[in-house]
């Protein structure tokens, strides 16, 4: 049976994550307040950030930058801005 959460990103009730995907208190906050849909959106943005900014996940500063962007995206409603990227027009 799926869980329902009030998603902080989407501002609506939606299907929650199946398990905690991120460690610590932030992971618990994500599990309790972020939907599968919003997490999927974040994963796409995260991939773009890692590739475009050439982030190395072995570097603690790069991991901290990615975590900050994640919190901004999931909880503060800020979109990820990547210099030089123009989203495709619909």
From Swiss-Prot:
The keyword Nucleus does not apply. The keyword Iron applies. Pfam families: Iron_traffic (PF04362). GO terms for molecular function: iron ion binding. One of its GO terms (cellular component) is cytosol. Keywords: Iron. Transmembrane segments: none annotated. It comes from the Bacteria. One of its GO terms (biological process) is cellular response to oxidative stress. Gene3D superfamilies: Fe(II) trafficking protein YggX. Coiled coil: none annotated. Belongs to the Fe(2+)-trafficking protein family. PANTHER family: FE(2+)-TRAFFICKING PROTEIN-RELATED (PTHR36965:SF1). Could be a mediator in iron transactions between iron acquisition and iron-requiring processes, such as synthesis and/or repair of Fe-S clusters in biosynthetic enzymes. This is Probable Fe(2+)-trafficking protein. It comes from Vibrio atlanticus (strain LGP32) (Vibrio splendidus (strain Mel32)).
